[in-house]
């Protein structure tokens, strides 16, 4: 068996989140909101924050935003979608008030410069192709299937075995 090293990953001391509470409050959110798929197969997002008083900032392609990918057999990296000024996303969406998501958001905001924060859905037996985001990302698996993994800088992380503590 191959031994995986996570020495190149940054861990924040004393940063812990309760995944059970996130799951419980996810159910509350899903009673109020649906995942926006943008018509893209196996993709869905629910924005957690927005540009203050700007509902357009969480609509259409503002839900996804710019990224780079290898689109074809040439291997050339190309830009996709629209550029977004993530630093403007500072207001928590009203439906996340009085949830554990707000506590997580406020904790992260006190330690890091945040941009857009979203709940993302990847349906079972679906994948994302290689891509690069314009900013660093933090991914917290809330619900995942055994065998689910994420490759970050050629290192594979098993989502169901990771924890935030």
Regions found by a protein language model. Name each.
Residues 1-104:
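Non-heme Fe(II)/2-oxoglutarate
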Residues 114:
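Acidic-glycine-rich active-site phosphate/pyrophosphate-binding loop
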Residues 118-131:
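Conserved short histidine dyad/triad with adjacent acidic residue
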Residues 150:
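Short aromatic-centered micro-motifs
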């Amino acid at each position: 068996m191959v031994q995986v090293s996570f020495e190149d990953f940054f861990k924040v001391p004393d940063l812990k989140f309760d995944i059970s509470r996130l799951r419980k409050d996810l159910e509350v959110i899903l009673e109020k909101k649906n995942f926006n798929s943008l018509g893209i197969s196996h993709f869905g997002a629910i924005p957690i924050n927005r540009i203050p008083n700007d509902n357009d900032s969480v609509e259409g392609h503002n839900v996804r935003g710019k990224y780079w990918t290898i689109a074809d057999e040439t291997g050339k990296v190309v830009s996709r979608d629209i550029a977004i000024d993530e630093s403007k996303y500072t207001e928590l969406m009203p439906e996340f008030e009085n949830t554990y998501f707000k506590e997580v958001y406020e904790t992260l905001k006190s330690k890091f410069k945040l941009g857009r924060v979203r709940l993302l859905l990847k349906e079972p037996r679906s994948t994302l192709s290689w891509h690069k985001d314009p900013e660093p990302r933090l991914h917290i698996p809330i619900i995942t299937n055994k065998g689910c993994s994420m490759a970050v800088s050629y290192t594979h992380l098993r989502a169901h075995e990771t924890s935030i503590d």
